[in-house]
């Protein structure tokens, strides 16, 4: 009994003499997370789960953001297989990468984005760090803004934008605003609305721009429109934050897809840039990306680099090794790079071809609607203009799965199912 009177009674002994204490202790131990609510399912992953449960042999999954070949199968680029074989033959170690990543990968990524003859590269007034794909690049950039962009907390996103943009910037401590971008009447770019809204954005705010193949709409500004946007950005002294997840994958030409980024820099606008190799190299699960900041001079770039490393260290310490080695091998080996560029163009051309076939099949079905926006849009995704109730019918009656906003992944369309898709769309829109 001495233990009970010492004021330091063992919990088990005290509980034996006081059943109420046992119940209270049990309640305390089991109720840490009773306040945690069930979160909503991811809308795109939810589409995939519903697709998997469907037993219809004609079912189509047009929600997934990954390339598929014309048989509807995942595609590993032959250049990636070659790079993997070359790397394996070297019997390399698995040591940690530096905080900023694989140096030869970072250098090659900057060259791919900005152009090999870029003044920025020659002067050294930039920093590139390897990131955990495009999402990681965005988060590193957002966290850097939160810590060092002293002018504003507002980030202006196009309406609509990739669904992950909002939580990435919000969770980093930034505030989200919007500007007009997509015109549902034309299923095209609302150029007038975009320029009007950007012209009214408070000076020294952050403007997020999709460099090419806008997700989710597939609607991109034309070069002359980009020029006017750049003029407004420069006049309003806005910070241009580019997300470039589809270089080469949009048009089949990497230089063409990077045109907007390069034009802004040529106009004296110091941008930051997020890159991903998920789509254009098919390295989805390898998580290969880069974040680049264009600075005033080389000294500023070194200071920014030091702070980016300080941000990265407590997040994940070092980026993954394998995917960066693959990408670096492809970008830095002339024959592999040439092969890769041809393969990227092949993927882009297949998607462009599927757009054309879909419109052709809709006409064959007798549709009198104007479907030109399907071929006008670019990249993996197409904003069909379908209404939520029409999407619901496609899912229930035809087992064609997509997100409620009518966005489809054209990469999921093949020459064997494009006719079925056109028939179904015609049935719900006639």
Swiss-Prot record:
Subcellular localization(s) per the UniProt record: Mitochondrion matrix; Cell membrane
GO biological process: 2-oxoglutarate metabolic process; aspartate biosynthetic process; aspartate catabolic process; aspartate metabolic process; fatty acid transport; glutamate catabolic process to aspartate; glutamate metabolic process; malate-aspartate shuttle
Modified residues (Phosphothreonine): 48, 333
UniProt enzyme class: transferase
Gene Ontology MF term list: kynurenine-oxoglutarate transaminase activity; L-aspartate:2-oxoglutarate aminotransferase activity; pyridoxal phosphate binding
Modified residues (N6-succinyllysine): 73, 90, 107, 122, 159, 185, 227, 296, 309, 338, 363, 396, 404
Gene Ontology cellular-component terms listed: mitochondrial matrix; mitochondrion; plasma membrane
Positions contributing to substrate binding: 65, 162, 215, 407
Transit peptide: 1-29
Modified residues (Asymmetric dimethylarginine): 313
PTM annotation (Phosphoserine): residues: 143
Enzyme Commission no: 2.6.1.1, 2.6.1.7
Presence of keyword Cell membrane: yes
Residues with the Phosphotyrosine modification: 96
Residue numbers carrying 3'-nitrotyrosine: 96
Pfam families: Aminotran_1_2
Cofactor(s) of this protein: pyridoxal 5'-phosphate
Keywords for this protein: Acetylation, Aminotransferase, Cell membrane, Lipid transport, Membrane, Methylation, Mitochondrion, Nitration, Phosphoprotein, Pyridoxal phosphate, Transferase, Transit peptide, Transport
Modified residues (N6-acetyllysine): 59, 73, 82, 90, 107, 122, 159, 185, 234, 279, 296, 302, 309, 338, 345, 363-364, 387, 396, 404
Note: In eukaryotes there are cytoplasmic, mitochondrial and chloroplastic isozymes.
NCBIfam families found in the cross-reference section: PRK09257.1
Family recorded in the similarity comment: Belongs to the class-I pyridoxal-phosphate-dependent aminotransferase family.
Role description: Catalyzes the irreversible transamination of the L-tryptophan metabolite L-kynurenine to form kynurenic acid (KA). As a member of the malate-aspartate shuttle, it has a key role in the intracellular NAD(H) redox balance. Is important for metabolite exchange between mitochondria and cytosol, and for amino acid metabolism. Facilitates cellular uptake of long-chain free fatty acids.
Protein name: Aspartate aminotransferase, mitochondrial
Species for this entry: Pongo abelii (Sumatran orangutan)
